[in-house]
Regions:
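Conserved small/polar residues in nucleotide/adenosyl-binding loops
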Residues: 163-170
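Short beta-strand segments
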Residues: 127-133
Length: 174
């Protein structure tokens, strides 16, 4: 890789970012959103170099977070939408999660039941979803299999009923 400066002057460890490449990729992502109507979010678990968020902000709809602190980072440094998912949410964090999140993914119907009153009483619309385990994996090694018994990769389809899927129309307290 050819760099436009001498690496001899760098103090290590350090990160070197190709801002031009970041902007080119951002333009591609922005055009995909414009052409399809989809929203593309930055997965902070994979890339949380928040010093680059001001560069990426014009191209993306927001961020995803796997917990309260990632959600705060996304809200404060990137802005836009904040989508949060987690195998479990500490009850004491939930008021703050509701204050900064636009979409919350729950890992089970039990979690939704536990936290829905916070969502409903937060004073602004928050969309919610349930993470469904695909119950199918290409890998044979259990260590890498997201579908093994006891997995934290969402609920299986078996407990999902028509009532769950239509809950917003049939439960008065939702």
């Amino acid at each position: 890789m050819h760099l436009p400066f001498s690496t001899d002057s760098l103090q290590t460890p350090c990160y070197v970012t190709d801002v031009a490449a970041l902007k080119r990729n951002g333009e591609i992502l922005k055009s995909v959103q414009q052409e399809t109507g989809c929203k593309i979010l930055l997965a902070q678990k994979a890339f949380s170099m928040f010093a680059t968020y001001p560069i990426l902000k014009p191209y993306l709809a927001g961020t995803t977070a796997s917990g309260l602190y990632e959600a705060k980072l996304g809200r404060e440094e990137m802005g836009g939408e904040v989508h949060i998912f987690s195998p479990a949410y500490p009850e004491q964090d939930f008021p703050e999660i509701c204050a900064i999140s636009d979409h919350i993914v729950f890992n089970s119907f039990h979690q939704w039941q536990l936290h829905k009153k916070f969502v409903q009483s937060c004073g602004r619309p928050i969309s919610c979803g349930i993470r469904i385990n695909p119950e199918y994996a290409e890998v044979e090694t259990d260590l890498y299999n997201p579908c093994i018994p006891g997995s934290r990769m969402g609920t299986t389809i078996s407990p999902v009923s028509y009532t769950h899927l239509r809950a917003h129309e049939t439960e008065a307290d939702l």
